[in-house]
A protein has these predicted regions:
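Acidic donor-binding segment of Leloir-type glycosyltransferases
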Residues: 1-6
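The conserved acidic donor/metal-binding loop of glycosyltransferases
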Residues: 32-36
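Conserved nucleotide-sugar donor-binding catalytic segment
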Residues: 79-153
C-alpha cells in the first residue's frame, strides 16, 4: 500500500522524519524524488535483511548527466563492520532498514548533510551493515538545488550535524562507532566542507563552532590523519586545527 503524505516544508530531514513517524511496516527505505531505482531495488536489499541484518545497503550510480559511475568499485558483497563502514556513503538511499532502528532516532532537520547526522548511529545500533555490490539506485546529481550542485555557505553546518551525532551517541553502542565518526568527520570536513569556508569573520566563527563540537571527541584522529595519502602540509593543517 502506498500512502502519500504532503507537506509544505521543503526539507529532506523533515520529510524523512514524517515518513518514519507515519509508517507501520517492519522495514523502511528512502528514495529522493529526483532519483530512480532499479526494478529489483527492494527485492535485492530485502535479501540482505533476510540474512538477519538490520541494514542492507547496495551500490548506486552517481549520475551527473554525462557519466554513470558506480559509487563503489572493487568491492564484494558481504558483512561490513562498524569500523569498516567508513567507505560507505553516509546517505539514506540505496538501503533498507529495520524500522526498530528509528525507535528513538530522527534525522537532523533544516540542514544540509541530514543523512550524515544519523548514519554512524544507525550503523552502530544495527551492529554492522550487509553490503550488496549490485547497482540498485541511481543518484541524480544534475538537480540545481542538490547539495552536490550548490556551492555556497549553506554547507557551513557540520557543527550542527556532528552535534546531532554526539547527542545520539549512547554508552551502550559499540565503541568502534567512535572511529567511524572520526573517519566521517575527516571525510566530510576536510575533503569537501572546508573549501566552502570563507576567509572572513563568518568563516572563522564557523571553524570555531566546529572545533568546539568535536573537541576531544574524535577518537584516533591523529592516527588517521598521519596515515592519509595527502601532502605533509595538509596533514599539518589538519593536526593544527584539532590541536589548537
Amino acid at each position: 500500500r502506498i500512502r502519500v503524505l504532503v507537506t509544505e516544508i521543503g526539507d529532506l530531514g523533515r520529510a524523512s522524519n514524517i515518513g518514519i513517524e507515519n509508517t507501520t511496516g517492519p522495514y523502511l527505505s528512502f528514495i529522493d524524488v529526483d532519483d530512480w531505482v532499479e526494478p529489483d531495488y527492494i527485492e535485492k536489499l530485502y535479501s540482505g535483511i533476510q540474512k538477519g541484518y538490520k541494514i542492507c545497503k547496495g551500490n548506486c550510480i552517481m549520475y551527473d548527466g554525462v557519466k554513470n559511475l558506480p559509487a563503489y568499485q572493487g568491492r564484494s558483497s558481504g558483512e561490513i563492520s562498524i569500523r569498516g563502514a567508513s567507505f560507505l556513503l553516509p546517505c539514506r538511499h540505496s538501503s533498507v532498514y529495520d524500522r526498530s532502528l528509528f525507535e528513538k532516532l530522527r534525522y537532523l532537520e533544516f540542514s544540509y548533510y541530514e543523512d550524515l547526522s544519523l548514519w554512524p548511529i544507525l550503523v552502530a545500533t544495527a551492529g554492522c551493515v550487509y553490503y550488496i555490490n549490485d547497482i540498485v539506485y541511481n543518484y541524480n546529481q544534475t538537480n540545481e538545488t542538490s547539495i552536490m550542485t550548490v556551492r555556497n555557505e549553506k554547507h557551513l553546518v557540520l557543527d550542527k550535524v556532528f552535534g546531532h551525532i554526539f547527542a545520539n551517541l549512547t554508552p551502550d553502542l559499540d565503541k568502534e562507532v567512535n572511529l567511524l565518526i572520526t573517519a566521517l568527520f575527516i571525510q566530510s570536513f576536510w575533503t569537501s566542507n572546508y573549501q566552502y569556508v570563507p576567509k572572513d569573520e563568518v568563516g572563522q566563527a564557523y571553524l570555531k563552532r566546529v572545533k568546539q563540537v568535536v573537541d576531544n571527541r574524535l577518537v584516533g584522529y591523529y592516527y588517521i590523519v598521519e596515515n592519509l595519502p595527502v601532502p605533509k602540509e595538509m596533514k599539518e593543517r589538519m593536526i593544527r586545527f584539532y590541536r589548537n
